Regions:
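Small-residue-centered hinge/linker elements
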Residues: 1-158, 162, 188-297, 301-308
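Short acidic-hydrophobic, aromatic-tinged amphipathic segments that line or gate anion-handling sites
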Residues: 68-69, 174-180
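PDZ peptide-recognition modules
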Residues: 158, 165-168, 177, 183-184
Length: 308
């Protein structure tokens, strides 16, 4: 990854996180955060700055050695919640009757169309999921910020978001209030660069051209990484380029199976599910691939239903 290459490159002194927006789920945020945590073992600095930290961005940024906030900025810290909507009464008013086929007590995807409230089973699984996720978030932030989980939960109970920025410093969530215009000088000081000297900064795209500090493998052997992202369709009946086209995935997996240079396959799955038929066909193709070489599955933000 870019973070790992930055860790190994002696010319790179640290990482600056400009916390503006990041469309990622908790699993992806956790992976990036762990990579940053590993980067810090090199002794290099990590600094985060934000005008408005969402809860997810703060979770990621809290791993930094220093967390900076604009004096007029804000930080969201208020826990997790699920707010499903139910459309049964609306559908009845417009004369629509849903025909539902489902298997399993906890298969709750259709509940908004056939119920007016959450079932006991769905409430149970959502509570377990949210409690587990929040527990991981608070434990990680508590460790990085040298705070207790109890203190973090107390702040969340206050629904912290629109409080003055000074509150975030007072309660230990933020280290320093600083205007964005002064951040560059702050970073120069950490990197040991004179205030009047130029400080080159590499973006993530620039890191693509930075070579890894590892010997080049000349054996010709390959570990393939195959990405399966999006909803799963049934194959030929679907014409969209988005999501997981089951027929294409099956062909690709067959090619990987037949390629003698590919010694193993990492299947990266980020999917909420979709077509039961398409999922079954992909499952069979993966099993055929397993007979020839090792297959490791890496699950992303979603690996639900057919994705699982």
């Amino acid at each position: 990854s870019s973070i790992k290459k930055a860790k190994e490159n002696e010319d790179i002194k640290g990482i600056y996180i400009q916390a503006t927006s990041l469309g990622a789920g908790f699993a992806s945020l956790e992976e990036i955060r762990n990579a940053l945590k590993d980067f810090k073992e090199s002794g290099k600095f990590v600094v985060a700055y934000g005008d408005a930290y969402t809860q997810g961005l703060y979770y990621l940024s809290s791993v930094a050695d220093k967390v900076l906030l604009n004096p007029q900025g804000m930080l969201e810290w208020r826990g997790l919640a699920a707010t499903p909507m139910f459309f049964k009464d609306l559908l009845e008013k417009v004369g629509v009757e849903m025909q539902v086929f489902k298997v399993g007590t906890y298969k709750s995807a259709v509940e908004p169309f056939i119920s007016t409230e959450m079932s006991a089973a769905n409430r149970e699984q959502i509570n377990v999921y949210l409690s587990s996720t929040w527990g991981q978030i608070t434990s990680a932030v508590a460790e990085s910020r040298n705070l207790s989980v109890e203190a973090l939960n107390k702040e969340a109970d206050r629904m912290l978001m629109f409080y003055p920025a000074e509150e975030s410093v007072k309660n230990g969530l933020v280290d320093t209030l600083i205007y964005k215009n002064d951040v560059r000088d702050y970073l120069k000081n950490l990197a040991g660069i004179d205030k009047d000297d130029n400080m080159p900064i590499l973006g993530i795209q620039d890191m693509i051209n930075v070579k890894k500090n590892v010997p080049r493998d000349k054996s010709g052997n390959v570990i393939a990484v195959y990405y399966a992202y999006g909803e799963i369709d049934g194959g030929s009946s679907a014409s969209t380029d988005e999501g997981i086209n089951s027929e294409k995935v099956i062909k690709d997996l067959r090619k990987l199976k037949d390629n003698e240079n590919v010694k193993a396959v990492v299947l990266r799955v980020n999917s909420p599910g979709g077509s039961a038929y398409g999922s079954e066909q992909i499952w069979y193709a993966v099993n055929q691939l397993k007979k020839e070489k090792p297959v490791i599955v890496s699950m992303g933000d979603y690996a639900a239903s057919g994705g699982y």
